[in-house]
From Swiss-Prot:
It is found in: Cell inner membrane. This is ATP synthase gamma chain. One of its GO terms (cellular component) is plasma membrane. GO terms for molecular function: ATP binding; proton-transporting ATP synthase activity, rotational mechanism. It is a peripheral membrane protein. F-type ATPases have 2 components, CF(1) - the catalytic core - and CF(0) - the membrane proton channel. CF(1) has five subunits: alpha(3), beta(3), gamma(1), delta(1), epsilon(1). CF(0) has three main subunits: a, b and c. The gene is atpG. It comes from the Bacteria.
Length: 294
């Protein structure tokens, strides 16, 4: 049985840890509100961009001059897998769930004989995938020194992806991230970026009122300008969803840790009090026994 001194030290240690987890929970809660607002504000713009692309893409059906970012290369042999995670841990299974989904996709492609290249965004994803896919990682991004993720970071990633695509390095690009739902729910999500994935009902959801639109210049020229911007927008939305999800998961994880620390302190206090009571009882028995012997 642990001594009273050991128990006091353990109680003090757990209380110190509880203070840290409580502080981290409060910090995550403060950051979550801003991150959630940013993620929710980005969704309508990205969805509207999908609808614009759907309308423009309709006019490109069957045309041989469709932009490569929309039409693709005509092959799906080489895949670029973009894995977006957090740079830091202590957020429950947030990072591991994204990596797990990406790893399943990678293993499936490899099993089909496809070539896979990986671009990681976030230190946790890079570290996890380096263990069994180090040779496939072509580029890694970290934003540990950046206080708030901005559109310029998404544009930087987008430029890298487009440069790799134009250099013939891959045929299909898919990004893996976590879609924020609420504090306790983040959904690991996969979204195809190249060729641009246009929802089948996006174009039909726009009421054209029977009007016929003429584009100047034509759809192809407009798409050449819009598609790179759309790629940046979709990556930016994924990053914002990730940030909100990370803080939500961290807030939940630290809340659980704080509660668990409280439960442990109660159990240790009970053990301490019982040990102390047993020690006092033993000393009393010894005193009484000594007195009777006299």
């Amino acid at each position: 049985m642990a001594s009273l001194k050991d128990l006091r030290n353990r109680i003090a240690s757990v209380k110190a840890t509880q203070k840290i987890t409580k502080a981290m929970q409060m910090v995550a809660a403060a950051k979550l509100r801003r991150a959630q607002e940013a993620a929710e504000a980005a969704r309508p713009y990205a969805e509207r961009m999908d609808r614009v692309l759907a309308n423009l893409a309709t006019g490109m059906t069957g045309r041989s001059d469709a932009p490569a970012l929309l039409a693709g290369t005509g092959s799906d042999q080489v895949h670029l897998v973009i894995v977006a995670t957090a740079d830091r841990g202590l957020c429950g299974g947030f990072n591991s769930s994204i990596v797990r989904l990406a790893r399943q996709h990678i293993n499936k492609l490899v099993g089909e004989g496809k070539t896979v290249k990986i671009l990681t965004v976030g230190r946790k994803g890079r570290d996890a995938l380096k263990r069994d896919h180090a040779s496939r990682i072509v580029k890694s991004y970290e934003f540990t020194g950046i206080r708030h993720i901005g559109f310029e970071q998404a544009e930087d990633i987008s430029r890298t992806v487009i440069d790799l695509f134009e250099a013939g390095e891959f045929d299909v690009a898919t990004i893996f991230y976590s879609k924020f739902v609420n504090v306790v729910s983040q959904i690991p999500t996969a979204q195809q970026l190249i060729p641009a994935s246009v929802p089948a009902d996006a174009g039909g959801s726009v009421d054209l009122g029977g009007a016929v639109y003429e584009y100047e210049p034509d759809e192809g020229e407009i798409l050449k300008d819009i598609l790179p911007r759309n790629l940046s927008v979709q990556i930016f939305r994924a990053l914002l969803e990730n940030v909100a999800g990370e803080f939500g998961a961290k807030m939940s994880a630290m809340d659980n840790a704080t509660r668990n620390a409280g439960d442990m302190i109660k159990k240790l206090n009970i053990t301490y009090n019982r040990s102390r009571q047993a020690m006092i009882t033993k000393e009393l028995i010894e005193i009484i026994s000594g007195a009777e012997a006299l």
